[in-house]
Amino acid sequence: MRKLSRRQNENLKKIKNVVHSSLEEAITLLQDTATAKFIESVELHANLNIDTKYADQQLRTTVTLPHGIGKSMRIAVLTNEANFNEANEGGADIVGSQELIDDISQGNLNFDLLVATPDMMPKLAKLGRVLGPKGLMPSPKSGTVSTNLTETLSDFKKGKFEYKADKTGVVHVNFGKANFSKDQLMENLTSLYQSIEQNRPSGVKGKYFKSLFICTSMGPSIQLDLNTFD
């Protein structure tokens, strides 16, 4: 077994395996355990009572957090030439048509998000093997297939992003950086929790949340009481 570092041992002593009902106390502890030599991301890990092999128990949606997540997103837009100006003026970092498809097919994925107009989707079908594993395939559900590029780009530039439950029914998602203010992290986390709650799959029976943990990129997990947001 790998020996824990001094920093890790000190952080484990801080959390004391307590389940926190106070969001403010949990966020304070979260920031106190952000002791790495870089600015750590902060994460929510929500274990949900869902079985994602059933269509009515899948969770995949988008959210815009009040204070973003501290990351600038590089956005590519795949559309026809008639929409190039709108995409460029909307703040797209890459705009293209067939030439962008060719780049993607060669594995050039120098973007964090791909937005496409509906007319380009048939041409993207053959690139599912390239884009799918990276989570970059545009879809109407994620808001990345759109005819209104101006609005779509504005939303994503403001921090809108997609999240989903994995095969085990757990949502792993960043909600900011450890150097955000306590209030910013509390507001972001509350908004994220509310988004998960509001998008509860129709097939869920009984309680929805099984457990909630927050942590920094390199820090220990801090458990939240399931009634923290009530």
UniProtKB/Swiss-Prot annotation:
Localization in the cell: Plastid, Chloroplast
InterPro entries: Ribosom_uL1_bac-type, Ribosomal_uL1, Ribosomal_uL1-like, Ribosomal_uL1/biogenesis, Ribosomal_uL1_3-a/b-sand, Ribosomal_uL1_CS
Keywords on record: Chloroplast, Plastid, Ribonucleoprotein, Ribosomal protein, RNA-binding, rRNA-binding
Subunit structure as annotated in this protein's UniProt entry: Part of the 50S ribosomal subunit.
Family: Belongs to the universal ribosomal protein uL1 family.
One Pfam family linked to the record: Ribosomal_L1
Record's keyword annotation contains Chloroplast: yes
Recorded coiled-coil stretches: none
GO MF: rRNA binding; structural constituent of ribosome
Purpose of the protein: Binds directly to 23S rRNA. Might be involved in E site tRNA release (Potential).
Biological processes annotated in GO: translation
GO cellular component: chloroplast; large ribosomal subunit
Organism: Thalassiosira pseudonana
Gene behind this protein: rpl1
Designated name of the protein: Large ribosomal subunit protein uL1c
